[in-house]
From Swiss-Prot:
Modified residues (Phosphothreonine): 338
Known function: Forms an icosahedral capsid with a T=7 symmetry and a 50 nm diameter. The capsid is composed of 72 pentamers linked to each other by disulfide bonds and associated with VP2 or VP3 proteins. Interacts with gangliosides GT1b and GD1b containing terminal alpha(2-8)-linked sialic acids on the cell surface to provide virion attachment to target cell. This attachment induces virion internalization predominantly through caveolin-mediated endocytosis and traffics to the endoplasmic reticulum.
Localization (cell): Virion; Host nucleus
Keywords: Capsid protein, Caveolin-mediated endocytosis of virus by host, Disulfide bond, Host nucleus, Host-virus interaction, Late protein, Phosphoprotein, T=7 icosahedral capsid protein, Viral attachment to host cell, Viral penetration into host cytoplasm, Virion, Virus endocytosis by host, Virus entry into host cell
Listed name of the protein: Major capsid protein VP1
Chief localization: virion
Length: 362
C-alpha cells in the first residue's frame, strides 16, 4: 500500500501570490453642488445626493410637515377645502454639467440616470406618543400616526407627466393649487383632457393627480398606497436597496438640457390631536442617484438650432390671435416672378393637390 501524500505545500516551494484587489470606481472629488461644475472624462460616473421636503400644508411655523386640521363636508356640492389641508407633490430640478460644447456634431453626450437609492427620512419620529396626541387609554400614551398613507418618488430627464382624476368633480379647490380644468363627471374616472407636467413645487394636490402610465417614457416612478382608517404605516430603513432605472433596452432616463428631475410625496397617515382633530403627517425623502455619460445621436439639426436661437431673440407680444381656430388673418398672397397685366384683378389662383396652378373666376 502506497503512503498517503502529505497535505500542504512542499518544503521550499514559493509562497502563493495574494489575489489582486477588486476594481472599484475611483473617487476623484467629493463635495457640494459646486462639484457638478468640474469637467470629467467620458467614462466618469457622477453620484448626486439630495432630499425633498414634504409639502403637507404647514399651517404655521411650528407645524412643518403637518397639514391644517381636516374637516369633512356633509355634501358633495359644498366641498371646498382650505389650501393648507391639501398635501402636494414635491419636485425639483437638478442642473448637471454641460457635456457638449459643439451641438452640431452627429453624436452628443447626455447624462443617463442608472440607479437610485432612496428612503423616507424620520420614520422613528412617529414613535413620539407623548406630544399632544389623543390618548388611547386614560393613563396611557397617545394614538400613533395611522390611516391612509401614500409613498411615491420619481426620477427622470423630464418633468413628471400627470393625469388628473378627481374624487368629486364639484369640489372647489382654492387658489394657489393647480387642478384639472373644466372638470365634469367624467373626471371622476378617466378624462384624457386632464394632462399636466409637474412643473411647480407645492402646487399639484396629491388627491387630484397621479403619474400618467401612458407617458413618462423618460421618467421612472414608483409608488404605493394603503387605505384604511386604522392602517399603520409600514416603512423600511436600509442603505443596501438599489433601484435600477434602466428599461428593457438597457437605457435609463436621458437628462435633456443637462437637467435631472426628482419628485416625491410621502404621506405617512393622520396625526390625531388631543382635541380629536386630525392632520396629515408627511416626511422628507432622500435620493442618491448615479449617472453616467451616454453617447446618443444628435436629435437637433442645425436648422432647428438656428431657428430656435432666432425665435428666442424675438420680442414676445401678448396680442390678439393671428393663428389657430380664432385667427384674425383674412388672406395671404404669395407673388413669384412676373406676368402680363391681367384684365380681371379678382381672379382666384391656387395650387391644387397635384401641384398644378389653377385659375378660378369669381
Amino acid at each position: 500500500m502506497a503512503p498517503t501524500k502529505r497535505k500542504g505545500e512542499c518544503p521550499g516551494a514559493a509562497p502563493k501570490k495574494p489575489k489582486e484587489p477588486v476594481q472599484v470606481p475611483k473617487l476623484l472629488i467629493k463635495g457640494g453642488v459646486e462639484v457638478l461644475e468640474v469637467k470629467t472624462g467620458v467614462d466618469a460616473i457622477t453620484e448626486v445626493e439630495c432630499f425633498l421636503n414634504p409639502e403637507m400644508g404647514d399651517p404655521d411655523d411650528n407645524l412643518r410637515g403637518y397639514s391644517q386640521h381636516l374637516s369633512a363636508e356633509n355634501a358633495f356640492e359644498s366641498d371646498s377645502p382650505d389650501r393648507k389641508m391639501l398635501p402636494c407633490y414635491s419636485t425639483a430640478r437638478i442642473p448637471l454639467p454641460n457635456l457638449n460644447e459643439d451641438l452640431t456634431c452627429g453624436n452628443l453626450l447626455m447624462w443617463e440616470a442608472v440607479t437610485v437609492k432612496t428612503e423616507v427620512i424620520g420614520i422613528t419620529s412617529m414613535l413620539n406618543l407623548h406630544a399632544g396626541s389623543q390618548k388611547v387609554h386614560e393613563n396611557g400614551g397617545g394614538k400613533p400616526v395611522q390611516g391612509s398613507n401614500f409613498h411615491f418618488f420619481a426620477v427622470g430627464g423630464d418633468p413628471l407627466e400627470m393625469q388628473g382624476v378627481l374624487m368629486n368633480y364639484r369640489t372647489k379647490y382654492p387658489q394657489g393649487t393647480i387642478t384639472p380644468k373644466n372638470p365634469t363627471a367624467q373626471s371622476q374616472v378617466m378624462n384624457t383632457d386632464h394632462k399636466a407636467y409637474l412643473d411647480k413645487n407645492n402646487a399639484y394636490p396629491v388627491e387630484c393627480w397621479i403619474p400618467d402610465p401612458s407617458r413618462n417614457e423618460n421618467t421612472r416612478y414608483f409608488g404605493t398606497y394603503t387605505g384604511g382608517e386604522n392602517v399603520p404605516p409600514v416603512l423600511h430603513v436600509t442603505n443596501t436597496a438599489t433601484t435600477v432605472l434602466l428599461d428593457e433596452q438597457g437605457v435609463g432616463p436621458l437628462c435633456k438640457a443637462d437637467s435631472l428631475y426628482v419628485s416625491a410625496a410621502d404621506i405617512c397617515g393622520l396625526f390625531t390631536n388631543s382635541s380629536g382633530t386630525q392632520q396629515w403627517r408627511g416626511l422628507a425623502r432622500y435620493f442618491k442617484i448615479r449617472l453616467r455619460k451616454r453617447s446618443v445621436k444628435n436629435p437637433y439639426p442645425i436648422s432647428f438650432l438656428l431657428s430656435d436661437l432666432i425665435n428666442r431673440r424675438t420680442q414676445k407680444v401678448d396680442g390678439q390671435p393671428m393663428y389657430g381656430m380664432e385667427s384674425q388673418v383674412e388672406e395671404v398672397r404669395v407673388f413669384d416672378g412676373t406676368e402680363q397685366l391681367p384684365g380681371d384683378p379678382d381672379m382666384i389662383r391656387y395650387i391644387d393637390r397635384q401641384g398644378q396652378l389653377q385659375t378660378k373666376m369669381v
